[in-house]
Amino acid sequence: MPTAAPIIGIVRHSINVDGEGVCTLVAFHSCTLKCKYCLNPHSLSGVEKYKKITPEALLERVKVDDLYFQATNGGITFGGGEPMLRAEFIEEFKRICPSNWRISIETALNVEQSFVRRMFNVIDHYYIDIKDINNTIYESYTGKSNQQVIENLKFL
């Protein structure tokens, strides 16, 4: 069983913004990038504003919206930070949540491909923030190369 994961926020009742239908966004702490325009700077290392939650505790918290998820083809969208870093947590959550919930992920894809391969059969829908295809621009925004992103896009 996975340990609890650091979560910086849970936003319920997002409609057609963080996924199809009614969705709940679950944002994880930690990221592989340091984007100059980061939407969630409190998700970065060094900023310890999070609560550790188990997959079971998350399910207890969000299952109140099961009817909304079923009626709208909605579900849970994992974001962050970089949710691919929490593959074990997401796998366990998918295993225990209702099978008709849609599991989506908002990712920059700048992670080792082993994470992407692990999540391939877990995630129903990907929202990929590519930042920029030009590596020079990408590096100036994020502090890292986009080569891993390109390799992961080819895999998907």
Language-model regions: role of each:
Residues K63-L67, T72-G75, G79-L156:
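Conserved AdoMet/S-adenosylmethionine-binding subsite of the radical SAM
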Residues M1-Y50, V64-Q70:
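N-terminal [4Fe-4S]-dependent radical SAM core
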